[in-house]
Amino acid sequence: MAELPGPFLCGALLGFLCLSGLAVEVKVPTEPLSTPLGKTAELTCTYSTSVGDSFALEWSFVQPGKPISESHPILYFTNGHLYPTGSKSKRVSLLQNPPTVGVATLKLTDVHPSDTGTYLCQVNNPPDFYTNGLGLINLTVLVPPSNPLCSQSGQTSVGGSTALRCSSSEGAPKPVYNWVRLGTFPTPSPGSMVQDEVSGQLILTNLSLTSSGTYRCVATNQMGSASCELTLSVTEPSQGRVAGALIGVLLGVLLLSVAAFCLVRFQKERGKKPKETYGGSDLREDAIAPGISEHTCMRADSSKGFLERPSSASTVTTTKSKLPMVV
């Protein structure tokens, strides 16, 4: 008995399996799919198999940059029933329900930026395991650029360099950036400017007074454009020094004013302290003792050869002591 060649036997076996419905084949588009923000995306998926009681369809989703093993289901069809699940459950459905005639296309309404990623269409129909029943579709939600933010850094004096930056927080595909100068002033020469359309940065070198003006950044992708503006003012270096000196003088005047205020306040507080007073019973060094008259003092002094009157006419004198004399 002649033996059949190996390749012929494999081909015959494959044909038999296909005819008998023992092979599951899933077909999806090879090109990525793009859908504008807010529209409905149709993710086409077809299959070939003999649908039986064990037929099951599953759609799942994985975010960009993550492995397929981290995908999570968004829709099931099994035992004749459809089960949407996950955060997209209210926006997913099947183009044909039940999907039992070879069409398993998924509809996703009101697409969001977070819907961008890879979608997996998987058909299971035990015991049909001969081929891979899995198809992958990459979806990108197209989003126009958001209003960009313009900023500036660096020295803006004559001869200096500065960098103008522009960036949009949203936009898919990623927008490109272009800087233009407004008005009738000439655009800086290419030798004094470097522009990066990807990062949105414009570097201006060797600034001059004519570099002053309003610059506009335009962010653009296939969904639209948005812009922001920035005014650049280039100054003479001396103006910067004068401004610094003026600020220093103002600070010095402020410090002197504070010091003068503190000194006046201190003097006022010091003047409020109470002065010492003398009571009626206090004796002065030049007062005349009770019982001694002014004439007695004069006779005593005359014995020494001179007369001396009290230093003050207001000195109280007593001619007769009211105190008893002790002999």
Curated annotation (Swiss-Prot):
Alphabetical list of PROSITE patterns matching this protein: IG_LIKE
Disulfides per UniProt: C45-C121, C166-C217
Pfam families: Ig_3 (PF13927), V-set (PF07686)
Known glycosylation sites: N138, N206
Ig-like C2-type domain mapped to chain residues: 144-233
Extracellular topological segments: 24-243
GO biological process annotation, one example: lipid metabolic process
UniProt-listed PANTHER family: V-SET AND IMMUNOGLOBULIN DOMAIN-CONTAINING PROTEIN 2
Protein name per Swiss-Prot or TrEMBL: V-set and immunoglobulin domain-containing protein 2
Gene: VSIG2
